[in-house]
Amino acid sequence: QHRNPAYYRIYALGEFATLDRLVYPCVERRIVSADEVQGAKLWVGLDFGYVNDPSALVWGYWSEAAHTIYITGEYVKTGMLNDEIAARIIELGLSKEVIIADCAEQKSIAEIKRAGVYRIRPSRKGPDSVVHGIQWINQQRIVIDERCTHTIEEAENYVWKKDRKTGEYINEPEDAYNHCLDAVRYGLQSVAGMDKLRTINKALLG
């Protein structure tokens, strides 16, 4: 009844107790061909890190017609300064694309823009924006190119928090294994109507 059965049970049927442990339970891992993404919209997202957490630049395509998110490339590294991030974006040929980066790092965004990545923009964040973004992504088919090993590792380990009293998973993800996946969520803001999610949810819930 839905591309993501867990999503359908929770948001359409209201069966929140059946929430799967994984935030993204339905992910395909394979080689993505150029033909598949023909005509799809390119997106690029950036999550900042430094010493303990890596900076994660992730990109891919979104096919509105096929309701499919393709994650096709990643660059993940710790200890990167902003000028190094900008240089890598330029080397990868992504500097002319719209890049959506974590809005908590306005200074970093400004420094990367000054280094020649002129279309970098801050992400939009509002109340429950993380969960709303996750919900929208889970309405799509998710395909990760098998060469994106960091993103795959995160998808296999990114889980919902568990209520210690009830033992049930709650509607808030653990803050771990989420650097690449946060970058995906940011990047998709440039091509997808994620802001419309509240309306979609109300329609599903009747």
Which stretches of residues belong to each language-model region?
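Coil-to-beta-strand transition motifs
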Residues: 50-54, 66
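Short, low-complexity Ser/Thr-rich regulatory SLiMs
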Residues: 48, 61-63
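ATPase catalytic-site recognition across NTP-hydrolyzing enzymes
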Residues: 1-49
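Mg2+-dependent endonuclease catalytic cores in nucleic-acid-processing enzymes, primarily RNase H-like
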Residues: 58, 65-175, 194-195, 199, ...
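Anionic group-transfer/hydrolysis microenvironments
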Residues: 47-49, 104, 184
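Acidic, Mg2+-coordinating catalytic module of metal-dependent nucleases/exonucleases
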Residues: 175-193
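Short beta-strand scaffold segments in enzyme catalytic cores
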Residues: 55-60, 185
